[in-house]
Design a protein with these regions (language model features):
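Local sequence-structure signature of Cys/Sec-based thiol-disulfide redox active-site neighborhoods
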Residues: 2-34
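Short helix-loop-beta junction
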Residues: 35-39
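Thiol-based oxidoreductase modules, predominantly thioredoxin-like and allied folds used
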Residues: 41-53
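N-terminal, polar/charged subdomain of small-to-medium soluble alpha/beta proteins
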Residues: 50-54, 72-77
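Short Fe-S-cluster ligation motifs
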Residues: 51-64
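Short, charged, intrinsically disordered terminal tails
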Residues: 56, 77-79, 85-91
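A short, hydrophobic beta-strand/beta-hairpin element that forms part of a small beta-sheet core
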Residues: 63-72
Length: 91
């Protein structure tokens, strides 16, 4: 495992699907931004209120939902170590 130096996840993207005013979303985004800054991954935030109806139906009760390179990674909370490991894992 890497020693924490940046660059491990360059080119990877973590997307958070959430809502404005959601305290769990705010907490999750703090973790996502910290891990992505450390590893060199990109952060993308999408607003569930502006998402297509199908996506709102699928994820409404799970926000925040996190995706790594488009694949669902987690929902409700973001575990820092688990996200870090997912970003370091080669696909």
């Amino acid at each position: 495992m890497a020693d924490g130096a940046g660059g491990d996840a360059a080119g990877r993207t973590v997307t958070m699907l959430g809502r404005s005013g959601c305290h769990l979303c705010e907490e999750a985004l703090e973790v996502i931004e910290r891990v992505c800054a450390e590893l060199g991954a990109r952060v993308e935030v999408r607003d569930l209120d502006a998402a297509p109806a199908k996506e709102r139906d699928d994820y409404w009760d799970k926000i925040p939902v996190t995706f790594v390179d488009g694949a669902q990674h987690d929902f409700w909370r973001v575990d820092e170590d688990r996200l870090r490991a997912a970003l370091r894992r080669a696909d």
